[in-house]
Structure formats: structure tokens, C-alpha cells
Amino acid sequence: MIMTNNTLVSKDLANKKLHVVREFNAPLEKVWKAWTESALLDKWWAPRPWKAETKTLDFREGGLWLYCMVGPDGTRHWCRVDFKTIAAQKSFTSTAVFSDDKGNRDNSFPAMHWSIVFIPTTTGSKVEVRISFDNEADLQKILEMGFEAGFSMGLGNLDELLASIN
């Protein structure tokens, strides 16, 4: 288990899973919106100096989020997230893949199966993210690409955003 910027990350290579926990000093409703509305997602999802740009977000079961990560030099990496289940202000599950700008999967990168749970706390809320992979090599590839540090940085951005919005 590794704690980075108030983000707890544990890796279970044998079971092909990552578990990320972060607490926020913000009400659950505000945290939920930041995870489910494109205008807010674009402000925190990418680790700086990268930015996230949403092309489309249809947050419903069977819907999708098509976005790109834009680097400081203009490099664009597209991703597609397909929403599977949604329990409003409680949890959602999805599958995320790298794609082209039309949402066609890039099979040279692994799929990530996300389960995100939102829990109210006495000081705000906690988000628990469980990510599973099809095999251990896929998990290793994502880790080698810097996922752990990048996602932790994004969650730090979310902390800043939540403090700045009413």
C-alpha cells in the first residue's frame, strides 16, 4: 500500500486489481457531480500540465464518455469509457479503453474495469475506486505508463476544485 497526496493506493497483482481510496472535505453531492459532469471532469481528470477535454459525455447506463488527454505540446490521447451500472450518488461501474477520436478501441492498450463507490463521512466523503484488469500483464502495463502517480495527481486536482466551487 502506498499513500500519495492523501491517496491510498494498493496493488494486488495476483488478482489483477488496483484499489484507490481518497477522502474529500466536500459533501457527497458535490463529489458525485465532479465525477459525472463533463464541465467539472475536464477541470480535474488529467494530471497537470495535461488537460482533459470531453468530446461527449452521456452519463447513463449504456452511455459513454469520450474524451482526450491533451499534453502541453498539443499531443492528444483519446479514451472511451462505457458506463455499465449507475446507482445515483452511490456508485457506478464502467470499462475504460484507449481509443481514437471516434471512440474506436485501440487494442494495443489494456481495458480497465472500474467500480467507483461514493461514501458519506462525518467530514465530507470518501471515494473508493477498484480497477480490475483482464490479466496481470495489462495491470503491469498501466502501472508502467504512470497510472498511479497520474491518477493520484488528478485526485489532488479534484481536491482543489472541490474547495473552489460552491
Name the predicted role of every residue range.
Residues 1-51:
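Hydrophobic ligand-binding cavity/cleft-lining segments
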Residues 2-3, 134-166:
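A conserved amphipathic terminal alpha-helix motif
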Residues 19, 52, 76-81, 110-114:
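Short, surface-exposed coil-to-beta transition loops
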Residues 27, 72-74, 86-88, 99-101, ...:
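Short coil/turn motifs at secondary-structure junctions
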Residues 28-29, 58-60, 84-91, 117-126:
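A short, structured loop/turn motif at beta-sheet edges
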Residues 31, 41, 65, 83, ...:
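Hydrophobic pocket/interface hotspot
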Residues 53-99:
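Glycine-rich portal/gate segments that line the openings of hydrophobic small-molecule binding cavities
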Residues 95, 103-149:
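Beta-strand/loop substructures that line and gate deep hydrophobic ligand-binding cavities in soluble
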